[in-house]
Amino acid sequence: MGAGAEFDAIRGLLVTWGAQAAGIGDDAAVLAIPAGERLVVSTDASVENVHFRREWMTAEEIGGRAAAAALSDLAAMGATPCGLLLALGIPKGWLSELEPLARGVGTVAASAGCPIVGGNVSAAGELSLTITVLGSAGQPIPRSGARQGDIMFVTGRFGGPGAALRALLAGRQPVAAHRARFVAPVPRLREARWLAEHGARAAIDISDGLVADASHLARASGVSLSLDERAVPCVPGVSVEDAFASGEEYELLVAVPPASDIRADEFEREFGLPLTAIGVVIAPGASAVTLRGSLAVGLRGYDHLS
């Protein structure tokens, strides 16, 4: 590795990650996946003033949050992580923050059992982290597998990240528990594999909001969903409407055949997390989401380009 600020930055990243990035050094990474499994790949961007503001979070939190968001896409597919690549755009004055930023990425990747296998560093006007994650799954869970009669389940409780974001945008200090859910989401990797083993046949992670992502799943599956907003588990102090619209939850919405052996009490004992039935797949063709019979309009969630 040569001399200069760029290579000094890369060396600093490698020192921070240690053995977790031991394979970095060639022009490309070479990964092995278990025989009979399929490669699952996703890329996720975290951009300053779009996904976060620097005054809201520490550098370590920014790195960890970006890694968790990317790994959540593997969770949605029921995949086991096998590699992470980080492309960093660094603004002037941020070199001193690289070590905690890298530590945040590394801590979350390590908790997922995911090695860091490569990346890139470049100058940028604003901080950005583009993370590519790779995983493997014997039978990936698509968005497109929901069928009429399936039961729709969600993991976790909703509304914390949205409540934290509203407080931050208003210049207020968020409730500590809400802030923790906003800055330190947990990708539901183990939970997704358990759900897949127990019959889940369609899944999506909740990044844009529950209604928005339910609509994505319905459209991919060519079905309509009937959800009961009264059943949606909300964090204390958050309305159902706000919980439905709250993005960046990184919980899972899954479709499960009625004959499945999934038991919510068994799931909660295993993971310390609620699993709640919130609706059913009602019909093929229309690709709509209804709340007790009424179309779910006005609860669209986040749209990057609107």
Regions from the language model: what does each represent?
Residues 62-74, 104-105:
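Short, well-ordered amphipathic alpha-helical segments that serve as non-catalytic structural scaffolds
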Residues 40-43, 142-193:
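Short, acidic (Asp/Glu-rich) active-site segment that either coordinates a divalent metal cofactor
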Residues 63, 67, 98, 145, ...:
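Short, conserved glycine- and acidic-residue-centered signature motifs
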Residues 27, 150-151, 249-252:
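Short, surface-exposed beta-edge/turn micro-motifs
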Residues 1-12, 37, 57, 91-117, ...:
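Glycine-/charge-enriched secondary-structure boundary and capping motifs
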Residues 1-58, 77, 82, 86, ...:
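Extreme N-terminal cap/leader segments of soluble proteins
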